[in-house]
Amino acid sequence: MGVFRFISISLAAVSAANAAQILSMPHAQTVPHSYIVMMKDDTSDDDFNHHQSWLQSTHTHNITRRATIQNAGMRHKYNFRKMKGYSGIFDEETIKDIAKDPKVMFVEPDTIISVNGKVEQSNVPSWGLARISNSQPGANSYVYDSSAGEGITVYSVDTGVDINHEDFEGRAIWGSNQVNDGDDRDGSGHGTHTSGTMVGKEFGIAKKAKLVAVKVLGNDGSGPTSGIVAGINWCVEHARQNGGTDKAVMNMSLGGSSSSALNRAAAQAVEQGMFLSVAAGNENQDARSSSPASEPSVCTVGSSAEDDSRSSFSNWGPALDLFAPGSNIISARPGGGSQSMSGTSMAAPHVAGLAAYLMALEGISGGAVCDRLKELGSSSITDVGPGTPTNVLISNGGAKGGNPKPAPGPSPNPSQPSEPQQPAPSQPGEPGESFPGEPFPGEPFPGEPFPGESSPGESAPAPAPMPPSPQHPHTPYPGGDNFDFDGYWKKYFGGEHWRKMFGSFWN
């Protein structure tokens, strides 16, 4: 009896020692009882299936304990070939049981990610398109090769897209909705704006690329990390089955507190051949405190102003790869027409659009695209911020291909854009392929982007010091002297907001 008791205690000690880490997010806004579980890299499909069967059995056994938790159980399942995991609603004891499985790498509380607060300004001249194709600021024409991203698919992981907007010319399709709100539209306007910059006929860079809308943020611009990871997984699988990940670009104008799960998902997408453009954030602080901007394998983008200075709101630091226009950018809005927004959310789609353009023109893909963007860019940005290793502003100049001709920039009136006047066809470069296949049926998604800056002409605030801990909430990157912080936090983090958005999680 004593021997049996000794063995039992020893096994319990070994189990406890090998238990996966349950990560703490003390400063983050978490979704009640919601967790993300990541399996170890060597987990086979059989191991994963066995774990899921065990989890179902555990839920059945703990049914009385979970009676007070609504909608308990698995919600998303992730399978990136080399990375497997899932998310769900679980009670504390079940989470402890999950962590004891030797195949589990870590368990992470599900946190909220949001779009960055938006800054809208009327009658602002458009300048971003012209800047990336001219050597000096102040130009008013966009010069590009007529291949214009043809054959490349761009995935907008955002608040959704008005796919019927005239600027998309029928090249945009609905893909997936990870928000589970049953609302396949862009109620925020953020996703339509970023998509217009990427592929729009008038406002866009890659004017012949296809667009797939993947909604991971709700109409209020926020959503849990678990849904964003699911959105990334969906994009990778869709690209693999529809033309290949080497002809796919993903834009993520969103961010929040540091998340191992989100960074690992982004890294898996890059490893499997996709190009990811990610907004650095709008807090005027070190971008290493945010995910997915802190993931080294993605292309992390800071924002520049019209005078080639770093935008006053833009994050900085070692995580940044490039800068792109992000202040007072005019692009499409839901329902037709246009509007002006500012933020690193506006800078990232310039990089995503130019990536699609270069992939079609030069036949490059994946991680090579960010390196090529650095080669083509100009060393123009001033006041890059502490520890920032680059002052490169993106440019399409010098890209090999056909003979580019200038095209007029977008209309300066954001409410009533004029009919776009495209240049006469130039000698084409490397032609791309037609859009490969049909999208998967839609489903909901969560996540969020980055907001405003101070008015033009104001001096930029001194950079904020590096936060002592990377564990703060996945929230938008607000910024700007006129930004209503009190109203923002009350709106997005007040109890009533979350009760309405995640009502099923509350008793």
Curated annotation (Swiss-Prot):
InterPro entries: PCSK9_ProteinaseK-like, Peptidase_S8/S53_dom, Peptidase_S8/S53_dom_sf, Peptidase_S8_Ser-AS, Peptidase_S8_subtilisin-like, Peptidase_S8_subtilisin-rel, S8pro/Inhibitor_I9, S8pro/Inhibitor_I9_sf. Pfam families: Inhibitor_I9, Peptidase_S8. Residues 34-113 form the Inhibitor I9 domain. Residues 405-428, 438-449, 462-476 have a biased composition (Pro residues). Residues 20-116 form a propeptide. It is found in: Secreted. The keyword RNA-binding does not apply. Residues 282-294, 378-394 have a biased composition (Polar residues). One of its GO terms (cellular component) is extracellular region. The keyword ATP-binding does not apply. One of its GO terms (biological process) is proteolysis. It is an enzyme of class 3 (hydrolase). One of its GO terms (molecular function) is serine-type endopeptidase activity. Residues 1-19 form the signal peptide. Residues 450-461 have a biased composition (Low complexity). Its EC number is 3.4.21.-. The active site is at D158, H190, S345. Residues 126-400 form the Peptidase S8 domain. Secreted subtilisin-like serine protease with keratinolytic activity that contributes to pathogenicity. Belongs to the peptidase S8 family. This is Subtilisin-like protease 1.
